[in-house]
Amino acid sequence: TPIKSSAASDVYKRQYLSWRYESWVGRMAGEAMVYVAFRSNIWLWRIVDALMLVLLPVGIIRLAEKTAGVRSADIWHGIASVSGYFLMAATTFGYAAVWMNGSIFYTWSFTCGIWALQPVADLVFDGEHFKRRQLFYAIPCAVIASMSIEQMGAVLFTLELLAVLFLYWRDRKISWELCLQTAVTAAAFAVLFLAPGNELRVASEVTNWMPQYPSLTFGQHLFITAQWLISSFANENKLFLAGIWMIGILLLKERRKDGSNDRSDSVWMCFAGIFTVVSCLPFLGITVLSDVGMDIGDIMLC
């Protein structure tokens, strides 16, 4: 492939990224990392991928602990997080962790998004532990996440913006550190979102996967979206999400042991418990949610 060519140079790298940006997609951070991974020794990718696989559950646990206001060394949090990830469908885990392109665009960007949120969570839930030096890793992580996957960029920017507004409402002051990270995230996401290649890629994807897409009504779009969300939960992501919900239950129980009298804890624990049970329904032979979205081709008949 062109990426592996021994004649590739820094000039060609810029040409390659420019070609991808103009003709296919705006995911420049992911494309650049893929380029470097293919041009380097395979062990570079293996080491970084292993690091990302470790940092993903660690980051999720840290965010959950900050949100719950609990610091714990309970091993069950780690077991729930890691097991939920590694027990996902073999194809899903393979695409996200073992396949080079997939790991870079999905696992790496998701991990970077999680770690970009660490200082945001500190400012919102645990201000005294926020350190400005966190920006040295958070901002690069925000750039990678928001310039690798559209959904991650949108979610990250939304959470950062909500944090800015919340801190102003609560403290009547603006955190310039958070504003800086939010501005960088917005700029990186704009670079991705405004890529000329996006329109070409969308046209190609529509032709290949759903030719009737342009003629769908708003209701049909909404129906498909709901079906795919449920299908994604009930098939690919059920155990990963179940692991996260179990972490939430464990942390809220610990908070209650520490003397918390917040009645909403019981409500959130109840919701998390319900979703955890629902995620296990396919193992009991109940596939009503797993089957949703599987035969979406006849959407025009709805």
Task: Report each predicted region and the residues it spans.
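Short hydrophobic alpha-helices at membrane interfaces in multi-pass membrane enzymes
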Residues: D122-I144, W176-C179
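Single conserved hydrophobic/aromatic residue that forms the stacking wall/gate
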Residues: T1-A8, Y12
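Hydrophobic, aromatic-rich transmembrane alpha-helices
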Residues: L56-R62, Y168, K238-D265
